[in-house]
Amino acid sequence: MENRILIIGDELFGEQGEAANRFAEILLCREANRPVQFSINAPAPQTLQQLYDRASADIIGKKAGRIIVGLGLKELKRGGKDYHGVFASYQKLADEILNKTLVPVHFLTVPEDMFPVAPSQLTALNDCIRGLQQKDEKRVKIFDFAAYVADFKEKQLERGKFGRSLYTEDGNPTSICNTFLALYLYDCVIKEMK
């Protein structure tokens, strides 16, 4: 369905998918005359491999008009794989989505603060995710949330405001971070829809 937005994500969207749900609510409130439906699978309990295995039912079968993907964090946190291994699974899923659909696909980068034990792993994973745009520059857009967060943090430091923590010490998003991501998604998606 042209007006259905499918969101597939992990803890990037919050412990219970708060950012995805807030984004849906913001879009419905701000665009009251736009017919839109949401299918939200965030946080997805499945691994990247399981999402790939079930892609025909859980992703392609949803018949979305737009797909937003925010994955990779859970796989890194789980351990056993570095960013190479995580991206191999991520890319396999991305290829499946791009080969079996004709709709716009948006891939989100993950802020480094969400994996404080090895932020360089997220930096490297994000660089790989950014490279996905080359697969189909008309359909694929990178929503660079990691860069957006870095810019926000820099502006906070310039102003001397330290009271707005986006993440806890162990990298979990705070309530303000979930709202921040929801607003960011709204801005990006509306820009793409117009």
List each language-model region with its residue ranges.
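Acidic/histidine-rich helix-loop elements
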Residues: F38-Q49, K77-D82, D170
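Structural recognition of the beta-strand scaffold that forms the well-ordered cores
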Residues: I5-I7, Q37-I40, R66-G70, P104-T109, ...
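Active-site segments of SGNH/GDSL-like serine hydrolases
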Residues: G70-K74, D95-D127
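Serine-esterase "nucleophile elbow" of acetyl-processing enzymes
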Residues: M1-A44, S56-K63
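Catalytic His-Asp segment of secreted/periplasmic serine-dependent ester chemistry enzymes
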Residues: M114-K194
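Solvent-exposed loop/turn segments at secondary-structure junctions
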Residues: E11-G14, A44-L48, L73-K77, P111-F115, ...
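Short, solvent-exposed loop/turn segments at secondary-structure boundaries
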Residues: G17-A19, G79-H84, P116-Q121
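Oxyanion-hole/transition-state-stabilizing segment in secreted/luminal serine hydrolases
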Residues: Q49-F87, H106, P111-M114
